[in-house]
Design a protein with these regions (language model features):
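A glycine-rich, often tryptophan-bearing local segment used as a flexible ligand/cofactor-contacting loop or short
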Residues: 1-68
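Short, solvent-exposed loop/turn and secondary-structure capping segments
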Residues: 13-16, 100-102, 146
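A structural signal for well-ordered alpha-helical segments within the folded catalytic domains
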Residues: 15, 19, 83, 122-129
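Extracellular/periplasmic catalytic domains that process cell-envelope and extracellular macromolecules
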Residues: 26-27, 79-84, 125
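Short, surface-exposed beta-strand/loop micro-motifs that present aromatic residues
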Residues: 63, 69-81, 85-88, 102
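Short beta-strand-plus-loop segments that form exposed binding edges in beta-rich domains
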Residues: 92-94
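Short, solvent-exposed loop/turn elements at domain surfaces
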Residues: 96-100, 141
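Extracellular ligand-binding/catalytic regions of CAZymes and related secreted enzymes
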Residues: 104-156
Length: 156
């Protein structure tokens, strides 16, 4: 599930949007969260990304925290729960507004300024693609580090 508070995290945990999110999520079994690690598969499920902007660009992205006893594979935490798919993503960059288009295919909301804003919108689309690829395919990208060993085992 993706929670987008659309507030750019300006107010932090005490903002009305954050309090509303806490109230909505209270009955859910939300796992412990952490800011998205730089090595998380969501950063490379299709596009290689370091930022995850929407209409806003500075809100942190939160995902399920790796278990403290997570195995290390190639120096990176190996998330073996849910095939490596985080069950929850939380941010406040207003991705839906960045992705929204009208019946003529024109952007409905401004993003950034000038060409920098259009680049921000493009990266926002890329984040959306990465998110969907991550949801649909799990951790297949992290499995790629094991391909040489698998081919060796198969005698290839």
């Amino acid at each position: 599930i993706l929670f987008d508070t659309r507030d750019a995290d300006i107010g932090g945990a005490g903002s009305p949007a954050a309090r509303r999110l806490q109230a909505l999520a209270a009955p859910l079994d939300v796992p412990p969260l952490e800011p998205l690690p730089k090595d998380h598969v969501l950063t490379r499920s299709f596009y290689l990304l370091t930022d995850f902007p929407g209409r806003y660009a500075n809100s942190p992205l939160w995902v399920e925290a790796a278990p403290p006893d997570a195995e290390l594979a190639e120096g990176m935490p190996f998330r073996n729960l849910n095939d490596g798919v985080t069950p929850v993503v939380i941010g406040g960059n207003d991705w839906a507004a960045a992705w929204a288009i009208d019946e003529n295919g024109m952007a409905m909301f401004p993003v950034g300024r000038g060409l920098a804003g259009e680049r921000q919108r493009e990266v926002s689309y890329r984040f959306g693609v990465n998110l969907i690829m991550h949801v649909l395919t799990g951790n297949y990208k992290s499995d790629q580090v094991h391909v040489p060993a698998l081919l060796e085992r198969l005698g290839q």
